[in-house]
Amino acid sequence: PFLCLSFLLAIKKDNTTVGVNIGNIAPELKGTTPSGDSISLSNLRGSFVLVDFWASWCRPCRYENRNLIKTVEHFKDYDFPSGKNWVGKTKTKKGFQVFSVSLDRSASSWKKAIKQDKLNWPWHISDLKWWNSDYASIYKITSIPENFLLDPDGRIVAKNLRGKALDNVLEKYRFKANLDKKR
């Protein structure tokens, strides 16, 4: 009996671990948008969120932005599971959100890239510290582009999804939401 209880306590503990591995609760990110507003990653709880690390000077990032825009456009009005312990729930929330974290040094370059690439979502932050970014340190970023897909509870469910791979994972969760609605 003691062994079973210890095992269950260990499972419970792992379910609330904050970290950057799949299954962990994603670390909080707080920052200032290009327009000066304060935002937090936790404000997006209840939605599927892609935390996307990029920079204006990163060619692969800029290329991937085109794919990301298509994904956002495709999934913006779809129902996804929502809420605490979302697996198996029928409650849904519309849309898919992107929380962009830039490793730029120049505010003007960062803002210009957002405009040029048409990254029209409101969730953009940068501490303008390049590779010395506190955000990069928290998420252990060593190269970009890099991203983390979070479920509605803020848990990391996938990492480094690009293009069709991201679309396929989102489609899987959207399909799950629609199945649950029919039950």
Where are these regions (language model features)?
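Thiol-/selenol-based redox modules, centered on thioredoxin-like
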Residues: 143-144, 149-183
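Hydrophobic h-region of N-terminal signal peptides that target proteins for export
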Residues: 2-10
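A short beta-strand-turn-helix
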Residues: 29-49, 81-89
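Short, internal strand/loop/helix patches
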Residues: 99, 104-148, 152
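Structural cue for short, hydrophobic secondary-structure segments
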Residues: 50-54, 100-102
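N-terminal "domain-start" segment that seeds a small globular fold
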Residues: 11-42, 175-176
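Conserved redox-active cysteine motifs that mediate thiol-disulfide chemistry
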Residues: 45-46, 53-74, 79
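Alpha/beta-hydrolase fold active-site loops
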Residues: 47-49, 96, 145
